[in-house]
A protein has these predicted regions:
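Surface-exposed, interaction-prone regions used to assemble/regulate multi-protein complexes
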Residues: 1-161
Length: 161
């Protein structure tokens, strides 16, 4: 791993701060998606008929929700189904997003206004992103431990570095 990776959170996501949580969903393989800001409706056959104007989440990294210094839900919960884990996340009141911070070069924390945190945890080596952020105008950001932050567009192919 490159020890010189810049951990600075991209300024391009600062417009997300202060936005209310409008969507939360646990998906396949215990992925997590949190939507913030305005609802952006789509016609895809999905549980939610909309995304958030801003979406932050992970496809494969472990995550946990901490509220008032108590662990209230996590991706490794002993549940019978993804629907059961999704039901747990639906009852949590997330409120507005305050900020995003790197806890270390491995882990990221989403800070919400009501003493709630969502943490994404890197627990294996590899090239998969820890977290991704979709924003307005096809903005796409991702963080991976081997590359740091990358910023681009979600509507065009990315070139290999």
């Amino acid at each position: 791993m490159n020890l010189m990776i810049d951990l600075t959170i991209p300024d391009t996501i600062s417009a997300m701060f202060g936005q209310p949580c409008c969507r939360k969903r646990v998906g396949r393989h215990r992925s997590l998606s949190l939507g913030f800001g305005e609802k952006v409706f789509h016609t895809k056959p999905m549980k939610d008929p909309f995304y958030g104007e801003w979406e932050i989440g992970t496809y494969s990294a472990p995550w946990r929700v901490i509220q008032d210094n108590l662990l209230v839900c996590g991706s490794l919960e002993d549940v019978e189904s993804i629907d059961e884990l999704d039901a747990q996340i639906q009852i949590i009141e997330f409120g507005n997003i305050s900020s995003v911070e790197m806890i270390s070069c491995f882990d990221l924390r989403v800070i919400l206004e009501n003493n709630t945190y969502v943490e994404f945890l890197q627990v294996a080596t590899g090239e998969d992103e820890l977290v991704h952020i979709f924003g307005p105008n096809s903005l796409y950001c991702e963080y991976a431990i081997n590359a740091g932050w990358k910023i681009g567009r979600s509507d065009v192919p990315w070139t290999q570095d």
